[in-house]
């Protein structure tokens, strides 16, 4: 690997406009850090690209040498795919330009943008791009994997709102992908992750929105069953303007909480209404009436405030692990299992996230994008979070154990952005009937699997055994 790194460095240094960072460089340590602290890896070389030509140069050199290559946009990969040990990281974090056409309600943004970059630019025109819920997330990884957030029920997945991509493929060429130009790649990039190349620009549709109604409240342990049963049945007929997420977690020990809640299991309810304020008030009041909530807040906030309110809950450097799946229906047996699980949470930062999709995201035809099955409305994410490596085993074992217990009730399928790095066997499950088409596109555009640090769709000639050894 050191010889490969030296070969890559020597090849790039005369024609690369950005920064080439190696161990010992003053900014290397900061540059190699990613969001998930479980993956404190040490790349042999970080190529921080300034423009598309830099990306092309890095990709061509990586392809020619065969060096292990990761692509970093926001460095927010839950599975740690934004980095690697000893190899090359193609870093797009300096490429964050956003251009908004307010009249056409369109935007173009570069591959290194964070959600915050896009939100601030589009809000100046009173517009939004439907994305995730943590503003320091990289937009590329989110969008390419699908992209869910507060606006999913109203406007669809992030990938549903993309009209075009500019892609650097494994041979270093630049291609445009639109419905009528490279349509197979356009299809695959909407949900297929980073398998097909490095996206340097996205062309997206925007929607008018500047403020939302946000209601939040904590339901105590005795009320959790009733809340889940009501939520399960209520959301199936709820307007698309309403997004109601529930987190089952342990309440903090802060003085602003009643004594009976501190450190105890709670259902944390967050309801976001994106339509007319008065209509939203009625729906939110109906929902809250069944929650018997404590510490209630119900207010109109700016969209930018909505997009940053969870940032501090998911800081850089903590350790994260998740297991996720879909349900057609949350039957009472599943609810019983969730109630047992919340009592046994390994730490206060670990939670069971529940969301109801449906709405606009379910109205896209099944084969229109590479994104997995949209027919199951309930999505669950078992997200373990902790600060120190000595607690890895207890948190990872908790997530795996609960997932295995719930798995028989789940519908086959998984959202790739919620997958951890040890779930390569579930990737075909994520894409289901789209798998063969995905493999065909991958085989054509990346036959040697240069872009393999992702939830990988191997080309037709790449064996799963080889793939796993290369990712380890």
What do these predicted ranges mean?
Residues 1-472:
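Soluble FAD-dependent oxygen oxidases
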